[in-house]
């Protein structure tokens, strides 16, 4: 049986080595997030200040996988 994951939205606050990021969730929690393989394969750039969707395990709520970078409303891309 597959483990249930919780999906949250948050803001990248800090970039760490090896594709890791500090993410502040909308509920105020700080989570250590790593980039999913699909984002890495598509060469999607994630920078501090970006809004992302992050998948967090129910068993370890301090780490998560970044699964989507949300588009900024004011950007031209």
Curated annotation (Swiss-Prot):
GO CC field: chloroplast; cytosol
Keywords, in A-Z order: Chloroplast, Initiation factor, Plastid, Protein biosynthesis, RNA-binding, rRNA-binding
Protein's UniProt keywords contain tRNA-binding: no
Coiled-coil ranges (or none): none
PROSITE patterns per record: S1_IF1_TYPE (PS50832)
InterPro entries in the cross-refs: NA-bd_OB-fold, RNA-binding_domain_S1_IF1, S1_domain, TIF_IF1
Classification via SMART domains: S1
UniProt keyword Mitochondrion, yes or no: no
Subcellular location: Plastid, Chloroplast
Pfam families: eIF-1a
Example GO molecular function: ribosome binding
Domain annotation S1-like: ranges: 1-71
Highest taxon of the lineage: Eukaryota
Function text: One of the essential components for the initiation of protein synthesis. Stabilizes the binding of IF-2 and IF-3 on the 30S subunit to which N-formylmethionyl-tRNA(fMet) subsequently binds. Helps modulate mRNA selection, yielding the 30S pre-initiation complex (PIC). Upon addition of the 50S ribosomal subunit IF-1, IF-2 and IF-3 are released leaving the mature 70S translation initiation complex.
Subunit structure: Component of the 30S ribosomal translation pre-initiation complex which assembles on the 30S ribosome in the order IF-2 and IF-3, IF-1 and N-formylmethionyl-tRNA(fMet); mRNA recruitment can occur at any time during PIC assembly.
Family stated for the protein in its record: Belongs to the IF-1 family.
Protein's recorded name: Translation initiation factor IF-1, chloroplastic
Species classification: Eukaryota, Viridiplantae, Streptophyta, Embryophyta, Tracheophyta
Gene encoding the protein: infA
